[in-house]
């Protein structure tokens, strides 16, 4: 028989068939059995029929040119790339097939999909609560589990109230593609229960992305009854900007070797073996930290902070607190701060603890589900997400015994951590991205990274760059205005209490003022309106004028009070700040407008009192009022051009970048906006939707129709101040004033020539070419071009007149016959009206009669 079949029964793995593989010089060492099989010159692939078992493990040899070595004990798989994991995988473990009707529907897919060589770890108090996954028997190195199963969400389809604890990111060409959510046990598999590893020593699984799936690979042999703990492989961690497993080991060794005796004593003190580990409250941690000397020399390692920049993918446009965009959770590398650091008389310049900032997903003060989430989530939340024995602070991975001591760090607003600071509360109207997490331990050490000068004033001068505060280069220009300028103090800083210099190391910090006040921050995406301004101000005044004012900011002590887009202008008060959230009944909504609104069919009619234009929403009316007031709060930092809406400014950016993302599929011409492309497509289709109601003329653009209507209305807005001539188009007036005005001082031509030139100017002014050229005036010098053409026409006429006079002299006075070549080209002559006639110069055709000679 030409094919050589090789079937190996591994006695330590029951009911397992090993797939024969095509190999040349094949050698394998059977684990635990130490059995050596060698097959030479076997070139054909032989496929064995595997048994129907969810835990079936299929053997795959490592392809090498010569002798294939199956012994990987010396390989350091933590340094492998995702491609190496996929290529050198030895065993493949498939999920147990799940049938909802097989067991009467008593188990969910996440539990029923567990392979037979694994077991669930249940909580002691609740036998049905899964808190981890352990091995049932020996699992060799190089075994692959997976793929991970869950619900798939793109960045735009994530539910508003989604629990991101079990989110896994999938990348395509180094760019974020979608999420896999394992939260729903009915739609996920057993891999959702695997807990994350917190050090390289405990890690035995590496998470890799192969294609668009997530797999778990064993990077070391796993004995029976050992828990499976996973962390990202090197490539995956690099995409997420997370530390490699080796870096976790460095942190572990640095922290444990500093003082092992003190480390072990605190371990026994904080976590007695007889008491289950649990989450500590802020009060308990303060009690444990009452003796600062105990923690004096612990965690002295200086680890450079890193920021998870790629987590910006989770930002929601509506600023939902469910998906915060920027870092909110701060993890201390050292032990919790001693009480000496918490005193109000803390001197500046004292040694500060180093913080590592992350872009977290929503944290919760309540205990998380016992089963583990993705390692990504474990870095973003310090609350325990696995079993009580695995509640670990992700940034102290080498200290699993101290993991609960940082559980207070994810206390959110309105909870115990922030409430413990008397008299201080964050402004509720701040966008979620601007609100860092606070707690009772170090609210004084959190400062936003503003550049602070010696007098305590903000030194930021760039709105679009925002230099140090480089979070919102374009999304929040109004907020940036409040931070720019050296004369504007930061709204939440007291200049008297600021030091001469403060560090701007990139950590998110914020100092509460000595006398806390509520601060006004304008909304990022809409016009700033004083909804309820008078309700929280003692003094108010409004100007008699009814036009909106520019959206700038003023200061009174430490209170920022921006002007409104409506005409209501409230005088700042030194006693309190305006609060846009707490509105009073007598000052809400449309009542902030400078004029009353009418009602139509019982509904408020949002009508402009200037042009009587109506709108469906109050916000649209407020934006429209800027057109009449001239307010343009959104400025381009390149050309300083102003816009009434943020969307217009963002569209304007394409002018400077030269980007033309929209392409015509007919002629492949590119445009910067969809509106320009839509107008261009009318040239190919011949569509002219704008028709004149007076004449049959049609136009592709409304502006052309608007200019055409002037021909019927005789509207001539452009007038010469010297000779009182008027024109429809501005370019016609410019040609007239360019040395062609008979009453002007710069006129250097004879009056007859000037009269003829002005006749041609008027003829051009009423033509359709003038309408088209006026649209091109920004890119072409229309005035010079028109003047050149008119002078050429006049010059040609003068030459023809000279030729006519010359022929008359040669042939005699009035002896021109009908056969004369001068009139052969046209049997009609042109009679011109005098230039003083206010009517347009329309050519009048008169038939030329034959001149006969008179008798003597």
From Swiss-Prot:
Entry comment describing in which tissues the protein is expressed: Expressed in bone marrow macrophages (at protein level). Expressed in innate lymphocytes, including tissue-resident conventional natural killer (cNK) cells in liver. Expressed also weakly in tissue-resident natural killer (trNK) and natural killer T (NKT) cells in liver.
Residue span, SET domain: 115-233
Phenotype upon gene inactivation: Early embryonic lethality. Compound heterozygotes display germ cell defects and a rudimentary or missing fifth digit of the forelimb. Conditional knockout in lymphocyte T cells show a weak reduction in tissue-resident memory T (Trm) cell population maintenance in the skin, gut, liver and kidney but not of splenic T cells. Double knockouts for PRDM1/BLIMP1 and ZNF683 result in a strong inhibition of Trm cell population maintenance but not of circulating memory cells.
One GO molecular-function entry: RNA polymerase II cis-regulatory region sequence-specific DNA binding
Localization terms from the record: Nucleus; Cytoplasm
Zinc finger (C2H2-type): 606-628, 634-656, 662-684, 690-712
SUPFAM superfamilies assigned to the protein according to its UniProt record, in alphabetical order: beta-beta-alpha zinc fingers (SSF57667), SET domain (SSF82199)
Region described as Disordered: 357-399, 532-571
Biased composition (Low complexity): 373-393, 542-556
The UniProt record lists the keyword Glycoprotein: no
Family designation: Belongs to the class V-like SAM-binding methyltransferase superfamily.
Function: Transcription factor that mediates a transcriptional program in various innate and adaptive immune tissue-resident lymphocyte T cell types such as tissue-resident memory T (Trm), natural killer (trNK) and natural killer T (NKT) cells and negatively regulates gene expression of proteins that promote the egress of tissue-resident T-cell populations from non-lymphoid organs.
Protein name: PR domain zinc finger protein 1
UniProt gene name: Prdm1
């Amino acid at each position: 028989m030409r094919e050589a079949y090789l079937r190996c029964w591994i006695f330590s793995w029951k009911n397992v068939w090993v797939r024969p593989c095509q190999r040349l010089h094949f050698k394998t060492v059977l684990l635990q059995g130490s059995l050596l099989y060698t097959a030479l010159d076997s070139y054909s692939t032989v496929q064995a029929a595997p048994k129907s078992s969810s835990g079936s493990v299929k053997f795959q040899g490592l392809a090498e040119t010569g002798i294939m070595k199956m012994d990987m004990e010396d390989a350091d798989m933590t340094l492998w790339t995702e491609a190496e994991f996929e290529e050198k995988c030895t065993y493949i473990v498939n999920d147990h097939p799940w049938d909802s009707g097989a067991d009467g529907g008593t188990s969910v897919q996440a539990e029923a999909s567990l392979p037979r060589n694994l077991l669930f770890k249940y909580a002691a108090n609740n036998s049905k609560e899964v808190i981890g996954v352990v091995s049932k028997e020996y699992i060799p190195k190089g075994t692959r589990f997976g793929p991970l199963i869950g619900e798939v969400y793109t960045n735009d389809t994530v539910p508003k109230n989604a629990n991101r604890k079990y989110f896994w990111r999938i990348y395509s060409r180094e760019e974020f593609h979608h999420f896999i959510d394992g939260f729903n046990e009915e739609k996920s598999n057993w891999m959702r229960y695997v807990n994350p590893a917190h050090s390289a020593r405990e890690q035995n699984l590496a998470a890799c992305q192969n294609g668009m799936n997530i797999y778990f690979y064993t990077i070391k042999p796993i004995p029976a009854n050992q828990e499976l703990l996973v962390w990202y492989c090197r490539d995956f961690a690099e995409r997420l900007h997370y530390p490699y497993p080796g870096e976790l080991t460095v942190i572990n060794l640095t922290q444990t070797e500093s003082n092992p005796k003190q480390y072990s004593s605190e371990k026994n003190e904080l976590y007695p073996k007889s008491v289950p580990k649990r989450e500590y409250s802020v009060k308990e941690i303060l009690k444990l930290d009452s003796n600062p000397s105990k923690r004096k020399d612990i965690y002295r390692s200086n680890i450079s902070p890193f920021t998870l920049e790629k987590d910006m993918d989770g930002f929601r446009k509506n600023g939902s607190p469910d998906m915060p965009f920027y870092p909110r959770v701060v993890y201390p590398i050292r032990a919790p701060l001693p009480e000496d650091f918490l005193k109000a008389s803390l001197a500046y310049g004292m040694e500060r603890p180093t913080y590592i900032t992350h872009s977290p997903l929503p944290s919760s003060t309540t205990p998380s589900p016992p089963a583990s989430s993705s390692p990504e989530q474990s870095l973003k939340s310090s609350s325990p997400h696995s079993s009580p024995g695995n509640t670990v602070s992700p940034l102290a991975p080498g200290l699993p015994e101290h993991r609960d001591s940082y559980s207070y760090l994810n206390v959110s607003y309105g909870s115990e951590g922030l409430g413990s600071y008397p008299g201080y509360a964050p402004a509720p109207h701040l966008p979620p991205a601007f609100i860092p997490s606070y707690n009772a331990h170090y609210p004084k050490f959190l400062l936003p990274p503003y550049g602070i000068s010696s007098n305590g004033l903000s030194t930021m001068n760039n709105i679009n760059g925002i230099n140090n505060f480089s979070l919102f280069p374009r999304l929040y220009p109004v907020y940036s205005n409040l931070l720019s300028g050296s004369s504007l103090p930061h709204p939440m800083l007291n200049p008297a209490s600021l030091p001469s210099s403060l560090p701007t190391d990139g950590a998110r910090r914020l100092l509460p003022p000595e006398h806390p006040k509520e601060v006004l921050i304008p909304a990022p995406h809409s016009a700033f309106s004083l909804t309820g301004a008078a309700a929280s101000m003692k003094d108010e005044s409004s100007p008699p004028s009814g036009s909106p004012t520019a959206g700038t900011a003023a200061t009174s002590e430490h209170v920022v009070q921006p002007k409104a887009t409506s005409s209501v202008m409230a005088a700042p008060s030194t006693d309190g700040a305006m609060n846009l959230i707490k509105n009073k009944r007598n000052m809400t909504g449309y009542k902030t407008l400078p004029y009353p609104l009418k009602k139509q069919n019982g509904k408020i009619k949002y009508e402009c009192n200037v042009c009587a234009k109506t709108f469906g929403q109050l916000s649209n009316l407020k934006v429209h009022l800027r057109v009449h007031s001239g307010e343009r709060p959104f400025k381009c930092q390149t050309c300083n051009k102003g816009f009434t809406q943020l969307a217009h400014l963002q569209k304007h950016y394409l002018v400077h970048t030269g980007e033309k993302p929209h392409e015509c599929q007919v002629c492949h011409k590119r445009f910067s906006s969809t509106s320009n492309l839509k107008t261009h497509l009318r040239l190919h289709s011949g569509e002219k939707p704008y028709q004149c109601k007076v004449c049959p003329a049609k136009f592709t653009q409304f502006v052309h129709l608007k200019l055409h209507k002037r021909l019927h209305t005789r509207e001539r807005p452009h007038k010469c101040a010297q000779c009182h001539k008027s024109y429809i188009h501005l370019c016609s007036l410019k040609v007239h004033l360019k040395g062609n005005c008979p009453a002007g001082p710069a006129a250097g031509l004879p009056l007859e020539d000037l009269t003829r030139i002005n006749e041609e100017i008027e003829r051009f002014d009423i033509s359709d070419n003038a309408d088209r050229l006026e649209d091109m005036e920004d890119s072409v010098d229309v005035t010079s071009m028109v003047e050149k053409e008119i002078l050429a026409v006049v010059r040609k006429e003068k030459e023809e007149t000279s030729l006519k006079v010359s022929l008359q002299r040669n042939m005699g006075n009035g002896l021109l016959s009908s056969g004369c070549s001068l009139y052969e080209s046209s049997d009609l002559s042109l009679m011109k009206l005098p230039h003083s006639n206010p009517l347009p110069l329309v050519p009048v055709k008169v038939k030329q009669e034959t001149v006969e000679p008179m008798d003597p």
